[in-house]
Amino acid sequence: MSDNDTIVAQATPPGRGGVGILRISGLKAREVAETVLGKLPKPRYADYLPFKDADGSVLDQGIALWFPGPNSFTGEDVLELQGHGGPVILDLLLKRILTIPDLRIARPGEFSERAFLNDKLDLAQAEAIADLIDASSEQAARSALNSLQGAFSARVNHLVEALTHLRIYVEAAIDFPDEEIDFLSDGKIEAQLNDVIADLDAVRAEARQGSLLREGMKVVIAGRPNAGKSSLLNALAGREAAIVTDIAGTTRDVLREHIHIDGMPLHIIDTAGLREASDEVERIGIERAWQEIEQADRVLFMVDGTTTDAVDPAEIWPEFIARLPAKLPITVVRNKADITGETLGMSEVNGHALIRLSARTGEGVDVLRNHLKQSMGFDTNMEGGFLARRRHLQALEQAAEHLQQGKAQLLGAWAGELLAEELRLAQQNLSEITGEFTSDDLLGRIFSSFCIGK
């Protein structure tokens, strides 16, 4: 298998459909057109033609589109054949094309990979293609499209350019010490570095929201049996997703619901009631509950308001609070306010949000929805946002750390070489986002998650 091979793949989903598309990219795309169509279509014009087998019989008829390189998606010669979407028809046409030497089925994401390697897209834009396809909400789709159009890349490239200018001054001072280039006399370098740090912080904030749009927030509902966890899951989901009874321990396994709150994806997880297990099945369910809690972005600590007047979670169940991972955000949810007569709404206790509601009637659930949205800093009015992946957040975080260390060198003992190295490492971290500095292993992991025809 060679990267210089001509590749072919179905660009439409498998199965029956009104239209099926085969995409071909590479040096042999011209030969495919001449062999299957009998001619080379006019560039960038739709041509209605028969698709012929080796013996001249017609396999199908449809639209052919010819995009000669470098003016194509991949930067190579590209041919698209749009025929009927029957699996048998597409399979016959694919087999016909593969009889031509040096053609092979494309690897997942190989079309996008070639576009990246041929400088048609940077890495963040290429990833945005997969994110646009996988978008689970309107806002996620719009943000993915912004990334595809270069919104995220432009912000990163601006930071890289600013760091380039800073590095020029710093390294000039190191290489030409006799020229008396003074960094500290007028404070310009410190001011420029502070500007870069501030810009990076703004990008990080937007990237965190973009990651939330893409990944979603994992919220685990936990508490003792019969506290109303499954009722709350149903109230948030807006449907009967979980069985609700008065029998303690009804929920034995983990239940998952994917919902959206004003465009924000949430993964709501209902767990088995936490207590001493009465049998092996319940024990396994409780173990799984703790596994989910340890991986959560937030825990909703469900409390049956009819069993205690306490509101501090450390007082209600100190053993549970002690076992939670450090820094895991907790929201205390006092349920059954319709029975206790408590005032609905949100307050704070010992640094934790406290919400009083009735999962059975739905009263107060909207307060919880707003709290979940606000707790992640989600802004539904954000314009021009972009999607971000975990690797982007890691790269931005590492760049921020290097800039802070570089600032310490500038304001401290003035170790010029160390400052220059911190700036270089920060620039390298940022360049990993767009692919200017990227390992082959990372490229393989990214593009292997794409669709075959992308």
Curated annotation (Swiss-Prot):
Enumerate the Gene3D superfamilies for this protein. P-loop containing nucleotide triphosphate hydrolases, Probable tRNA modification gtpase trme, domain 1, tRNA modification GTPase MnmE domain 2
Per UniProt, residues of the TrmE-type G domain are 216-377
What keywords sit in the KW lines?
A: Cytoplasm, GTP-binding, Hydrolase, Magnesium, Metal-binding, Nucleotide-binding, Potassium, tRNA processing
Determine if Cytoplasm is one of this entry's keywords.
Answer: yes
List the cofactors. Answer: K(+)
Report one GO cellular component: cytosol
Positions contributing to GTP binding? 226-231, 245-251, 270-273, 335-338, 358-360
What positions does the entry give for (6S)-5-formyl-5,6,7,8-tetrahydrofolate binding? Answer: R23, E80, K120, K454
Co-factor note (free text): Binds 1 potassium ion per subunit.
Q: Where does K(+) bind?
A: N226, T245, I247, T250
| Single Gene Ontology BP annotation | tRNA methylation
Q: Which SUPFAM superfamilies match?
A: P-loop containing nucleoside triphosphate hydrolases, TrmE connector domain
Can you tell me which residues bind Mg(2+)?
A: S230, T251
Family stated for the protein in its record? Belongs to the TRAFAC class TrmE-Era-EngA-EngB-Septin-like GTPase superfamily. TrmE GTPase family.
Quaternary structure and partners: Homodimer. Heterotetramer of two MnmE and two MnmG subunits.
Q: What does this protein do?
A: Exhibits a very high intrinsic GTPase hydrolysis rate. Involved in the addition of a carboxymethylaminomethyl (cmnm) group at the wobble position (U34) of certain tRNAs, forming tRNA-cmnm(5)s(2)U34.
Q: Which HAMAP family match?
A: GTPase_MnmE
Protein's recorded name: tRNA modification GTPase MnmE
Q: Which organism is it from?
A: Escherichia coli O17:K52:H18 (strain UMN026 / ExPEC)
